[in-house]
Amino acid sequence: MARMAVLWRKMRDNFQSKEFREYVSSTHFWGPAFSWGLPLAAFKDMKASPEIISGRMTTALILYSAIFMRFAYRVQPRNLLLMACHCTNVMAQSVQASRYLLYYYGGGGAEAKARDPPATAAAATSPGSQPPKQAS
């Protein structure tokens, strides 16, 4: 229990230090904090249909994050929080790109169309509709 109290005091002292306050009020903190929206949105969209994925935008986001991942590492002082954000975004967008490729070029779209009946057949068999009259 004494170790926990010591750890708690160290954390509290660190959070109250001038260096921590300066870090939290800098762009090295807030830039990555807001940039986490990109990978979080990509992770959220992984459950959505692959029809909504834009191949061009996904490619652009992969290249953008790869370039800025290198920038975050090379800038002085190194911004490892931003680098982690861009690394996560590259991985998330790569998953989205693979879903896009499988759907449009791997036959996933054709299978989805084969499963769904055409709209005219669905309308004809909808409840409350009358069967077509036969010619006599």
Curated annotation (Swiss-Prot):
Entries under InterPro entries matching the protein: MPC
Chain ranges on the Mother cell cytoplasmic side, renumbered to this chain: 43-51
Cellular component GO terms, alphabetical: mitochondrial inner membrane
Region of interest called Disordered, as start-end residue ranges on this chain: 111-136
Residue spans, topological domain Mitochondrial matrix: 2-19, 75-136
Keyword Transport set for record: yes
Locations listed in the record: Mitochondrion inner membrane
Signal peptide: none
Tagged with keyword Nuclease: no
Listed name of the protein: Mitochondrial pyruvate carrier 1-like protein
Transmembrane segments: 20-42, 52-74
Role summary: Mediates the uptake of pyruvate into mitochondria.
One GO molecular-function entry: pyruvate transmembrane transporter activity
Topology of this chain in the membrane: Multi-pass membrane protein
Source organism: Homo sapiens
Pfam families, per database record: MPC
Catalytic activity annotation: pyruvate(out) + H(+)(out) = pyruvate(in) + H(+)(in)
Family per similarity comment: Belongs to the mitochondrial pyruvate carrier (MPC) (TC 2.A.105) family.
Disulphide connectivity of cysteines: none
Biological processes, Gene Ontology terms: mitochondrial pyruvate transmembrane transport
Biased composition (Low complexity): 117-136
